[in-house]
Amino acid sequence: MKNILTEREQNVLFYVSQGLINSEIAEKLHISVHTVKAHLESIYYKFKVANRVQAAMKAIALGIIDLKAIA
């Protein structure tokens, strides 16, 4: 299931899991806040979830995000 996400979507999810807000993620990735929101919407659709917390939890459960990398 990891391959279902683009590299950029994985980057966005990593920063979501670290607790960053959209504007902080945009700054880190050198993209617009609108683009961050678009990536999140795509992630929600692919994961069949409703919000960023559910998306991060699913990514951790699927091994897309390593908890050790967050700490």
Report each predicted region and the residues it spans.
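Short, flexible segments with low predicted structural confidence
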Residues: E7, F14-Y15, A26-I31
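Hydrophobic residues on short alpha-helical segments
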Residues: Q10-S17, Y44, A56
